[in-house]
Amino acid sequence: MPTINVNKVDLERLSNISLSDKIIEDRFPMMGVEVEEIFEEVDKNGKKQKMVQFSINPDRPDYLSVEGLARGFRGFMGITTGIQEFEVLNSDIKVIVEENETRPYVAFALVKNVLMDEFVLESMINLQEKLHWAIGRDRKKLAIGIHDFDKVKAPFTYKEIKGDEIKFVPLGYEDEKMTPREIIEKHEKGIKYAHLIQNDKFPIIVDANGEVLSMPPIINGTLTKVTPTSKNLLIDITGTEKEAVEETLNIIVCALAERRGTIVSVDVNGKKYPDLSLKSRMISVESINKKLGLELNPGEMIQAVKKSGMDALYEDGNLIVKIPAYRNDILHNVDLKEEIAINYGYEKFEGKLPSVATTGSKDPVEKKCNAMSDLMIGLGFYEVMNLTLSNQDTLFEKMNLKVEEKDYIEVLKPASIEHRVLRTSILPLLLETLYINKHHSLPQKIFEIGDCVVIDENDTETDTKCKNIKKIAGAITHPLTNFNEIKSSTEALLREFFEDFEFENYEHPAFIPGRCAKIIKDGKEVGFFGEIHPEVILNFELEHPIVGFEITIE
């Protein structure tokens, strides 16, 4: 977990409370922030300063600065509760964004009249670097620039240039002007982050006079270097993910506003930043008590919500919770339940002895799956393990299946196009595995036991309206394989683990007509098996006949 070192005097000043070592060691862990150590260090003036090192959970990037940490602690201790709203003043400052392929997303904001000193400057630099890691993935996803606004002139332009198109003095080289290409070849930061520059295109931010503020994600210019005497700060965030860029900007401007800074909007190609509008979620009172094992009334829940820096009102059995813009960790209602638990007080939870003494044992479904695995291995199959994430092409198109979007769950922000859908079936992934292993000798007999995820509109237990289903699937390929071979293996499995099953003829687009059967148990379809259609075999770029089965375990 990332750690931050905080000056104790500065923390007390921002928290509006005197903090003994005991209070720090007792109370901060109860709000989810671990205290690593309390120590002394000598500052630049030779004076001893008491410092506190905290470990911050990655899901709370707003705690990566003393300002955000103090804001959270004030609420936790009940000093200031509810949403702390930050006013954003309008301005005519504009940023012109030209086409930028490398880092297409950009957001700006101005914070005026910041009460700057050595503490603030150090905290700001540390926050910038911690966010580069926590959200920016070491500047790959986003990069942050903070500038002395008084040294430049609006409007600003964000564009891409060639490596030798311009010269400026980068931070660390106080007098030597360098081109972007020279920076990535000679400058320490340039060498470190040169891999983030693509196709000899260098993102650059310049002011109305053509002066360079920054070459993101590499280095800022010396011209706008922030010092303890700077008071008006211009923040730029550039990156590859729009939501991350905007959320990071919100965290930084709200931290600087804790230093009595005034947030001023900046027009970026017609859109005003920052956007500090509140988010909203609805959560049932009953679900909160059920999850926490408590019997809190709505008033107690609202009090806990307000201590977490949010607001709430009660309406028809639900809490309507208002969430500030810097809280990017509230992704699901379970996060709200955690906030209520933290601010109600973990120390108030009472342990209860179970009424019946029991001993631990394996889950019955897992025991059944392990036994199935042993049987399949005994039948000569090799077990494989695929990812639960797949894609529409593998799951549906190659299997000749026609489905609508409502029939599967798609990942909102997939890491790759190959992993953007939660699988609804295992058999297509086995065919993909056979393709990967087509250079190996035949026969090949493989199986997998794992979870598939399906939509369940009748689900009342979760907010996601989906559930995991445990399935087993197998596939065989060699030149002479046929329906009888897969029927024999499937029957062996069914006789051992399923009772009173029967087969019926089944027309399935992925199988040869007349050579596919569905498995019926208690009047319900629980699986199917048969010979894979030649068209499907060719879709997976395979060459030999394939037979397969798939059965729902639970």
Swiss-Prot record:
Pfam families: B3_4 (PF03483), B5 (PF03484), PhetRS_B1 (PF18262), tRNA_synthFbeta (PF17759). Keywords: Aminoacyl-tRNA synthetase, ATP-binding, Cytoplasm, Ligase, Magnesium, Metal-binding, Nucleotide-binding, Protein biosynthesis. Its cofactor is Mg(2+). GO terms for cellular component: phenylalanine-tRNA ligase complex. Its main location: cytoplasm. InterPro entries: aa-tRNA-synth_II/BPL/LPL (IPR045864), B3/B4_tRNA-bd (IPR005146), DNA-bd_dom_put_sf (IPR009061), Phe-tRNA-ligase_IIc_bsu (IPR045060), Phe-tRNA-synth_IIc_bsu_arc_euk (IPR004531), Phe-tRNA_synthase-like_B3/B4 (IPR020825), Phe_tRNA_ligase_beta2_arc (IPR022918), PheRS_beta_core (IPR041616). CDD domains: PheRS_beta_core. Gene3D superfamilies: 3.30.56.10, Bira Bifunctional Protein, Domain 2, Phenylalanyl-trna Synthetase, Chain B, domain 3. GO terms for biological process: phenylalanyl-tRNA aminoacylation. Residues 276-351 form the B5 domain. It comes from the Archaea. It catalyses: tRNA(Phe) + L-phenylalanine + ATP = L-phenylalanyl-tRNA(Phe) + AMP + diphosphate + H(+). Tetramer of two alpha and two beta subunits. Belongs to the phenylalanyl-tRNA synthetase beta subunit family. Type 2 subfamily. This is Phenylalanine--tRNA ligase beta subunit. It comes from Methanococcus maripaludis (strain C5 / ATCC BAA-1333). The lineage of its organism: Archaea, Methanobacteriati, Methanobacteriota, Methanomada group, Methanococci.
